[in-house]
């Protein structure tokens, strides 16, 4: 007596769902990672802007500006934060670099820069 043919459609359907579910999970994690990266860029930009604002005044110091930027960046969730402030003759520039939390280990390094003219006292 010949063996009857078995219907294997259920197996291929479950394989399709496994592949589809994996792709959906990867997409979801990618969207979350993108949001974390954008948040990290916002935090780094805010830290750089605050540092420039603190250092550009007539009596502003780069050390105080560096502390302010470090505090903002670390409280915003960035790790391994480095802040470099360059106070030139006419402008001040702040570079903030840090690492955002990573789910997929991509887009974790963040670097933002802000600059502004120095405030000077002038005689009318």
Show where each model-derived region lies:
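Alpha-helical assembly-interface signal, strongest on the long, hydrophobic N-terminal helix that forms
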Residues: 1-66
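Short, conserved structural patches
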Residues: 60-124
